[in-house]
């Protein structure tokens, strides 16, 4: 199943610092997901001043439970970066043929 995940950061004064402190671990997780085919695309959501305030992810997992298990271990979850997460099932256009 394919999913569109929109995750908005906490808005407290320390939110960006937590994001930056957890960024390398989060990106290491993304690199693993790219290698195993579960990460299709994604990136940071920016505000009007180019400050990172959230993330969007296009992911593929066998089912919603597998996605939920993955998200629970993401450094942006465990590091209190993402506050609100919206998950929708999607049918995404492939970037390259399989």
State where each predicted segment sits:
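Conserved, structured core segments of small domains
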Residues: 1-98
């Amino acid at each position: 199943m394919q999913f569109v995940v929109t995750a908005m950061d906490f808005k407290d004064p320390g939110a960006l610092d937590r994001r930056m402190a957890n960024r390398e671990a989060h990106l290491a997780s993304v690199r693993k997901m790219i290698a195993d085919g579960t990460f299709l695309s994604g990136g940071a959501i920016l505000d009007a001043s180019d400050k990172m305030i959230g993330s969007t992810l296009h992911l593929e997992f066998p089912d919603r439970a597998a996605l939920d298990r993955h998200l629970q271990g993401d450094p942006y979850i465990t590091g209190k970066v993402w506050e609100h997460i919206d998950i929708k099932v999607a049918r995404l256009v492939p970037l390259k043929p399989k």
